[in-house]
Amino acid sequence: MSLSEARFHDLVDATQQALEDLFDESGLDLDMENSAGVLTVKFEGGAQLIFSRQEPLRQLWLADRSGGFHFDYDEDSGKWVCEKSEELLGEMLERIVWERAGEKLDFDEI
């Protein structure tokens, strides 16, 4: 069963807030902006992560210099799963943050 519009927005809002909290607490040198439902994380070296919601598809999208990734929410696991690779959002973020900032962050709760 597809996510309702309200549930989808609640999930994306909660995910973006959790990401903001995690990055705030990380001590990394970065800037964040959350505007109109789009969360942008800018790393010291200029790399960016952009998280946006795609309401018609009920997907969370992540843009990174390595590409664009589309995530569906899996109700059974309570996790966002990449549409193509089936990698969890948290796993992908751990790898990307390591590559961009040289730091290991724990995204298990994302």
UniProtKB/Swiss-Prot annotation:
Entry-linked InterPro entries: CyaY, Frataxin/CyaY, Frataxin/CyaY_sf, Frataxin_CS
GO molecular function: ferric iron binding; ferrous iron binding
GO biological process assignments: iron-sulfur cluster assembly
Keywords: Iron, Metal-binding
Highest taxon above the source species: Bacteria
One Pfam short name: Frataxin_Cyay
Classification via Gene3D superfamilies: Frataxin/CyaY
Entry's Gene Ontology cellular component terms: cytosol
HAMAP family: CyaY
Function of the protein: Involved in iron-sulfur (Fe-S) cluster assembly. May act as a regulator of Fe-S biogenesis.
Family from the record: Belongs to the frataxin family.
Annotated protein name in UniProt: Iron-sulfur cluster assembly protein CyaY
Organism: Pseudomonas putida (strain ATCC 47054 / DSM 6125 / CFBP 8728 / NCIMB 11950 / KT2440)
Lineage, highest ranks first: Bacteria, Pseudomonadati, Pseudomonadota, Gammaproteobacteria, Pseudomonadales
Gene for this chain: cyaY
